[in-house]
Structures are given as structure tokens and as C-alpha cells.
């Protein structure tokens, strides 16, 4: 988004959860920690999320819901909000991407884009 009042950047760190996975049953658990950084001039509330989850076989699942981990945080200008969540896949590798619907203090609705990020069991990729 080019309007400096509404600039939100999203960064992601992922981890494979070996202790919660069951490879013999095609169950691979991943955690991700997301930081939503409000680089805009307006405080903004994260209202909802939209995820597109693609496994290593190309199967796509879409998830929509209010807020993140039960919250709709208000993120001040120059501030950030960090949270952790997770997902389970049936393949060793996959991707997630999506967007957050944001509402600025002035009432403007805009999307914060979550660029694709990889979920992978260590050693699964060459």
C-alpha cells in the first residue's frame, strides 16, 4: 500500500515441532511466530485473518476468522504485535500466505499482505 498512513509489514519465523508430529501417520506440526509491524501514521486494529495453506502435494486449504489467537489487537503507529500459532500438515513441506484485514483509527479499511512463507521439516529440502 503506497499511502504512508496505512503501512503494515508482516514478518514470520517458523519451527518444525518434532515432539508434536507423527510422521508415520503423515502428521507434521509446525509453529510460526508472526510480528505485525505498523509502520503507518495511523493506529490500526487487526480485525480478521485470511490464510491460504498449500501442502507439498498442492492441496489448498483456506482459513478465515476474526482476529488472531482470540484477539483483535490495536497496533499503535510505530508499534508491533507479535503472536505465535501453529498448523498441522500431511506433508513434510508446505507454504502459507494470506492477509490481515486492518481498520485504521480514521475508519479506513485496508489489507496487510502476508507474503508466502515455507513450512518444512529440517532436511526435507535440498
Curated annotation (Swiss-Prot):
InterPro entries to which the protein is assigned, alphabetical: ApaG_domain (IPR007474), ApaG_sf (IPR036767), Uncharacterised_ApaG (IPR023065)
Gene source species: Pseudomonas fluorescens (strain Pf0-1)
GO BP terms, alphabetized: error-free translesion synthesis
Signal peptide per UniProt: none
Protein's UniProt name: Protein ApaG
Residue ranges crossing the lipid bilayer per the database entry: none
Gene3D superfamilies assigned: ApaG domain (2.60.40.1470)
Domain ApaG: 2-126
Amino acid at each position: 500500500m503506497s499511502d504512508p498512513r496505512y503501512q503494515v509489514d508482516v514478518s514470520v519465523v517458523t519451527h518444525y515441532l518434532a515432539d508434536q508430529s507423527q510422521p508415520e501417520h503423515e502428521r507434521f506440526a509446525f509453529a510460526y511466530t508472526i510480528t505485525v509491524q505498523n509502520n503507518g501514521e495511523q493506529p490500526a486494529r487487526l480485525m480478521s485473518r485470511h490464510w491460504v495453506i498449500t501442502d507439498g502435494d498442492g492441496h489448498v486449504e483456506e482459513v478465515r476468522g476474526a482476529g488472531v489467537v482470540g484477539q483483535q489487537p490495536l497496533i499503535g503507529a510505530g508499534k508491533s504485535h507479535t503472536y505465535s500459532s501453529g498448523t498441522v500438515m500431511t506433508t513434510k513441506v508446505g507454504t502459507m500466505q494470506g492477509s490481515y484485514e486492518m481498520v485504521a483509527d480514521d475508519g479506513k479499511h485496508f489489507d496487510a499482505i502476508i507474503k508466502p512463507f515455507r513450512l518444512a521439516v529440517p532436511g526435507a529440502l535440498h
